[in-house]
Amino acid sequence: MPLVRIGDRYVDVNIREELEEFEWENAKWTQEKLIASSPFRSSDRNPSFYIDLEGEYAGVFGDSGAYDTYYESGTLPKLLAYLRNESYEDAVDYLLSKYDYEYSNEDVILATPTPLDTSPRSHIMPEHLYAKPIDTEYLDGRGIHPKVVEMMGVFDNGNSIGIPWRDINGNVVAIKYRSKRDKTFYYEEGGAKLSELVYGLNIVVERGISRIAIVEAEIDAMTMMSTGVFAVAIGGARFNEHQADLIIASGVKEVILAGDNDLKGRQFNDKVAKMLRGYVELLTMDYSKYDGCKDVNELGTEGLRRVPLLNVDNKKDIRI
């Protein structure tokens, strides 16, 4: 395996194995390189993306057609952070914990956690980063109600929107920027890891909400909220014990599993169910009549109001 720089360490990484976890359009694999359509742009019909799999520049990627300079080039952690829908720091932790046997991250070791502890104060974002005009126009086009956008504090950031992530006490401890033009996103530097947070959970605690849906992405959560069902998001498809502890401690009684309508989404639902079973009542969305819909946002508010819910344990049809 090639030697790849991950954070401030060099480790042997099976780059091809990591990349084969994802679908690539117009992919051409060689021993040394992957050439494919850009994962950052759905409009890339002529492959403009490459990543070196071997050699001195193993793990380095480039995208000659990138709209955003942030994604013109970079290293494996940046690419995986995008593909896994997580922060750069979480991607680094993932790679080091998998490939560097000497690596130990104290932030990830959760010995008897106190679920409602706040994130470290050093992660609290300065107010000037997010005290900006609310952006309802972009998300209105995605079917999200303006009152939901305002409640979640989504703000205009020029060519992108800013999505604040708050800890259990409502402090903004991370900010995700999502491009208005394409699928790219990035995070404000110095923020907390999303693996330590649950998007929207502070409102669940503040308002004493007892019934929630769990989704992968923030926009899916806001879409669900626009139907009148509150939702929290994990920021990807990788649910962990710390996030489970936070949800259990929040006092919710009923959880709707609403991962994406694909294999990873079903695996996400299964993992959430495994960690929460016995603590809350579990329901799951029945996508059987909606095979063409990828996720909650694509299903839309009207579709969400019609989709059946099944009891996870006995598969009994539930009516809202």
Language-model regions, residue ranges each:
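Short, basic/aromatic recognition patches
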Residues: G141-G158
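N-terminal single-stranded DNA-binding subdomain of primase/primase-helicase replication proteins
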Residues: E18-L83, F155, D167, T284-D286
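Short, non-transmembrane alpha-helical segments in secretory-pathway proteins
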Residues: A131-G141
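Small-residue helix-packing motif on alpha-helices
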Residues: Y88-V92, V149
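Conserved active-site segments centered on acidic
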Residues: A91-A131
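Phosphate-handling DNA/RNA-contact segment within nucleic-acid enzymes
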Residues: N157-G251
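TOPRIM fold recognition
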Residues: M1-V13, V60-G62, Y70-S73, F185, ...
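Terminal peptide-recognition signature
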Residues: S38, D63, L80, L139, ...
